[in-house]
A protein has these predicted regions:
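Non-catalytic pre-domain segments flanking phosphatase-related domains
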Residues: 1-34, 42
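Substrate-recognition/cap helix-loop segment adjacent to the acidic, metal-dependent catalytic center
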Residues: 76-84, 90-118, 133
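Glycine-rich phosphate-binding loop signature in dinucleotide/nucleotide-binding domains
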Residues: 24-25, 81, 134-141
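Short, basic/glycine-rich phosphate-binding loops at helix/coil junctions
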Residues: 44-58, 107-114
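Short loop-to-alpha-helix "cap/lid" segments that border enzyme active sites
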Residues: 122-134
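Acidic, Mg2+-coordinating phosphoryl-transfer loop and its flanking beta/alpha structural elements
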Residues: 131, 139-171
């Protein structure tokens, strides 16, 4: 695209949710995972115990999570010019609970990306695709926060500095 040329209008993917409406261009952004980074999902972990993992119940209970205050505080101190992208492998079916949770804690965010209906890919693959989509939208991913070491490695491979938050969920 040449300087001064209008950017083609992009349709927002269905599994993306803007906080205050879509932006014309992405800009500098910081990416936060939710479960284990912003939300304390520890009381839901029992749904994932062997021999039977109940992902449906695990995600359905996400609206009751406590806030991880120390990480949430980062949202308040980051420069206002940075866009906050919440990138979670939660399925779209729990978007209502997720949005209510974000409202309850009055968290700063610009874009929420959740796993689309019928997407059963591994979290790492889903988030890798999201990184590509964000860049195509014009986002400059400056930093990420993640509790899954596989996703941390993916961000690093993609040239995005990523801070590992130990949630204990993957021990």
């Amino acid at each position: 695209m040449q300087v001064g040329q209008a950017r083609p209008v992009q349709r927002t993917p269905d599994h993306w949710r803007w906080h205050d409406g879509p932006v014309d261009e992405g800009g500098p952004a910081v990416v936060f995972d939710m479960d284990g980074v912003l939300s304390d999902a520890s009381r839901r972990q029992h749904f994932l115990d062997w021999p039977r993992r109940d992902w449906e119940a695990f995600f359905a209970a996400c609206g009751d999570d406590a806030l991880i205050d120390e990480v949430a505080r980062l949202l308040d101190v980051l420069d206002d010019d940075l866009r906050i992208v919440l990138l979670t492998a939660r399925p779209l079916r729990v978007r209502t609970q997720t949005l209510a949770w974000l409202d309850r804690y009055e968290l700063r965010w610009d874009l929420l990306i959740m796993r689309d209906h019928g997407d059963y890919s591994a979290s790492r693959e889903f988030k890798l695709d999201a990184v590509d989509d964000l860049r195509a939208w014009g986002f400059d991913l400056r930093l990420a926060f993640e509790d899954d070491r596989r996703n941390v490695q993916m961000f690093h491979t993609q040239g995005v500095p990523c801070i590992y938050i130990h949630s204990g969920y993957y021990d």
